[in-house]
Swiss-Prot record:
Membrane topology annotation: Multi-pass membrane protein
Protein name: Uncharacterized transporter BPP1579
GO CC entries: plasma membrane
Regions that span the bilayer: 4-26, 33-55, 68-90, 97-119, 162-184, 389-411, 415-432, 453-472, 482-504, 539-561
GO biological process, one term: potassium ion transport
PANTHER family assigned: K(+)_H(+) ANTIPORTER SUBUNIT KHTT, PTHR30445:SF9
Database matches in PROSITE patterns: RCK_C (PS51202)
SUPFAM superfamilies reported for this sequence: TrkA C-terminal domain-like (SSF116726)
Similarity section: Belongs to the AAE transporter (TC 2.A.81) family.
InterPro entries the record matches: AAE_transporter, RCK_C, RCK_C_sf, YidE_YbjL
Major subcellular site: membrane
Ranges where the RCK C-terminal domain occurs: 210-295, 296-379
UniProt subcellular location: Cell membrane
Length: 565
């Protein structure tokens, strides 16, 4: 064991990725659906590894540059994720959700600061308690930034000791922070004597939102593709264009003649024995049996690739129209609408869902039909899995430049710093990209790498560097005080947010369940709320608050450290 510990001490890269791998593995374990998750596990595993190393006389310490770089990548990734929703929160339809998402973090910050001062907790406790009680692991980074930026008077304590206290406070408060908000979002309607399930059903009927129990994948397909052998004398000798004119409800997608595939050319003259592949709505395919001839199981003729595209809604003729008005259009049986996004936020697809300018439609269907849909709705963009590294690089540079800006205030110079600058630049880039769709493409998988690897790696380094000093600061009295403050900071804000949303803003209780979860920037409670009411309605109240509170809680780790001392 001694040799292995020394090996890790002399090979920091192996140490780092061993910690990350173990954290992801440990984070997968759960008891009745509750677990640490990879990020919380990273700080636990990091501290444990460092403690084991110290027991064998090896003090692990990883490079500060690597730690900062990982955190900066994470912050930019957060900006990319929340940007469209954050900007969308500024419109009048979302303002109530945004207000709730501002109230909750401010209350949590105030309770943490006052609790730290009341109990006289040591440096670092405030930042860790905020991160743990609000289940916002990113706040650990901004709390660390307060130490590295030199805005705190450290006294006799070392940066490593403060980092250890941040990690300790985070670990003590995280469990209730996670479980508590789930229980509150799930049971607050019952405490208030409200039937949230009935409220969800009422909202579904009024807005055409599909129920969560509706099958997401069924054997029924409204669009069908079939092959017919041309034997009907009325069709022999007619061109494909003439056939389309007579039967506009069908899409000719292929013509097979002997060993040749002629495609769907309008000038092609149909001959006896040709095999024609037709696409259309299922009811239409069975309405005119024999129009060409008998149906045949010709796999070669039916081997038609489907197309996928993202369509940016720009045409005035379609904006303001609910989806139900397109049910009778020629495209209704030829393309399938997978999802709709507005400012980067997915919308439930219902009959009353109204299209707005700059909405993005994700469609699948036959290539000609997809192209036609692009002409009808606006501008088409093909799906791409490539990341625009040029925009990513300049977005990072913009963030660092914003971080350099400082303004005089209260006798000192104040600025966003690198982390805040990158968060802001990510918001700017993703907001523009979500509207134009033709630059700055960062697929979800690529953005997840920035966020997941960045945050887990950063937190792992914090744990490794702080672990050796952790046990020296842990006492029962301090741990109890930290838990009490964390419990209050986690429990009180959601209750107040619910009361304001229900009594003052008159928000539908099912929506408010999701809004309360969003105000704490935690998707778990929204998921449980959806299960509780048997509807997807709570998710509608979630995205705006999730974006706004996520940004605020991320930077509030810094303010918790500064204001508490």
């Amino acid at each position: 064991m001694q040799a292995f510990v020394q090996f890790l001490g002399s090979n920091p890269y192996i140490l780092l990725f061993l910690t990350i791998g173990l954290a992801v593995w440990v984070g997968k374990f759960s008891i009745k659906g509750y677990g640490l998750g990879a990020v919380a596990a990273a700080i636990v595993v990091g501290c444990l590894v460092a403690t084991v190393g110290a027991a064998y006389g090896v003090k692990f310490h990883l490079d500060e540059f690597a730690k900062s770089l990982l955190y900066y990548l994470f912050m930019y990734g957060v900006g990319l994720r929340v940007g469209p929703s954050f900007v969308n929160a500024l419109n009048k339809e979302s303002i109530n959700y945004a207000i709730l998402a501002i109230i909750a973090p401010i209350l949590g910050l105030a309770i943490v600061v006052l609790g730290t001062q009341f109990f006289g907790l040591p440096l670092g406790a405030a930042g860790g308690m905020l991160a743990g009680s609000q289940t916002m692991s990113a706040a650990i980074g901004s709390a660390e930034q307060a130490v590295s930026a030199g805005v705190l008077s450290l006294g006799s304590e070392s940066p490593e000791q403060i980092s250890a206290m941040i990690a300790l406070s985070y670990g003590i408060t995280y469990i209730w922070g996670t479980v508590g908000i789930i229980l509150l979002c799930k049971y607050l309607p019952r405490i208030w004597g409200v039937d949230a399930k009935a409220a969800a059903l009422e909202f579904e009927k009024a807005h055409g939102v599909p129920n969560v129990d509706d099958a997401g994948l069924t054997a029924f397909h409204p669009f069908d593709l079939r092959a017919y052998r041309v034997e009907n004398p009325e069709s022999i000798g007619k061109t494909v264009q003439q056939f389309r004119t007579r039967f506009p409800q069908y899409q000719v997608v292929n013509v097979e003649r002997g060993d040749q595939l002629l495609g769907p050319s309008a000038e092609t003259v149909l001959q006896q024995g040709d095999v024609v592949a037709l696409g259309g709505r299922l009811e239409e395919m069975t309405a005119n049996m024999g129009m060409l001839g008998p149906e045949v199981p010709d796999a070669r003729a039916l081997n038609i690739p489907l197309d996928q595209a993202e369509i940016l809604v720009t045409n005035k003729e379609v904006t303001g129209r609910p989806l139900k008005t397109f049910r009778g259009s020629e495209l209704a049986g030829q393309i399938q609408l997978q999802r709709v996004e507005r400012s980067g936020v997915p919308l439930p697809i219902g009959l009353e869902t109204t299209l707005q300018k700059r909405d993005v439609l994700f469609v699948t269907g036959l290539q000609p039909a997809v192209s036609k849909a692009g002409e009808i709705f606006g501008v088409i963009a093909r799906h791409s899995s490539a990341t625009d590294l040029l925009t990513l690089s300049f977005g990072m540079i913009l963030g660092f430049l914003i971080g350099l800006i400082e303004v005089p205030a209260f006798g000192a110079k104040v600025g966003l710093g690198n982390a805040g600058g990158l968060l802001l630049s990510g918001i700017i880039v993703s907001s523009i990209s979500s509207r134009l769709r033709f630059f700055g493409n960062t697929p979800n998988a690529a953005r997840n790498i920035l966020e997941d690897l960045g945050l887990i790696g950063f937190v792992a380094i914090v744990g490794i560097n702080a672990g050796a000093d952790l046990l020296t600061q842990l006492t029962g009295a301090i741990a109890l005080k930290i838990f009490i403050v964390g419990f209050l900071a986690s429990t009180i804000p959601p209750i107040i947010v619910w009361a304001i949303g229900f009594h003052i803003m008159k928000i539908n209780p099912a929506l408010l369940m999701g809004a309360t979860a969003g105000a704490r920037s935690h998707s778990g409670p929204a998921r449980e709320a959806a299960k509780e009411v048997g509807s997807s309605v709570p998710w509608l109240g979630f995205p705006v608050g999730y974006a706004v509170s996520g940004v605020l809680l991320t930077v509030f780790g810094y303010f918790a450290m500064v204001l508490a001392h």
